[in-house]
Amino acid sequence: MGKSQENIRNIIMQAVEAGRISAERTAKDAFKATERRLYGLPTLRIKLEDDLERLEEFKLYGPRERSKSITRFIKNGNRLSPNEIWEAVLVDMEATIAADRYEIETLERAIATVQGDAYYQALSGKYLDDVDDRDIAEALGCDTSTVWRHRKRLVQRVAVWLYGAEALR
């Protein structure tokens, strides 16, 4: 009986340790995902503008004959009329634009939660304006390590806003 109880205790300890490691990974993953999303925001804004222009062009002139967006709907073997293809491509483009808008709005709301912070420029400079840490440090009148620490703190706050309690575990 002593041997089986020891085995049970070892299994419980392993499970607790695995849970702890998993929780650390979740918080780290949320931080990294937040960084990826922040880095992508300027490009996503440009892409949205381009997609809106393409949508207007599509509405005025219709789809291009060899467009990838059309071939996706044609190659499955079903015969679709030009109107059905046009409708499908239009819905697809509008869905993509809506998803991009939602992501931009979500990130902008999350960023707004830290905009009043004295070290906000550490976050905006790095992820949104592509400014070097030395230049940010000079503008803020501090060391680059201070910029890094405060940026990490601000990204963590944004991560909590984006991912909720998952970012804390």
Where do the language-model regions lie?
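Secondary-structure boundary/capping motif
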Residues: 44-47, 118-122, 147-148
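Short amphipathic alpha helix immediately N-terminal
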Residues: 114-131
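Helix-turn-helix DNA-binding module
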Residues: 129-145
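DNA major-groove recognition helices of helix-turn-helix
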Residues: 147-161
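N-terminal interaction/assembly modules
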Residues: 1-114, 160-169
